[in-house]
Amino acid sequence: MFEELLLEGFEAHGFRTIRNKRYTGDGGIDGQVIIGKYRYLIQAKRYRGHIALQHVQEFEKLLKRHNCRGLFCHTGKTGAGSKSVSIASERMEIISGQRLIDLLTPGSS
């Protein structure tokens, strides 16, 4: 399960995580991680192509509702629209590509 792999990656890097009891019907939150003094909600998506802009926009709305920061972690490609939403957001970061590999690779920084 991709969600569990992400949480294990954060733990391997020394961060405290909060797991969901289930990953289906999770309301868009696939787990949580505490980084410094902030709680981040995690959205995990496995894509082959470009990530859906709608998913990024919905996650941003969810973060506003929860007044929380968030990490949108995915295996696909980040299109211009999704990048723009992430850059404009004060709450959300997208983790993909090399950053995702570094997170999932024990011993990397």
Enumerate the predicted regions with their spans.
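Mixed-charge (Asp/Glu-Lys/Arg
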Residues: 1-109
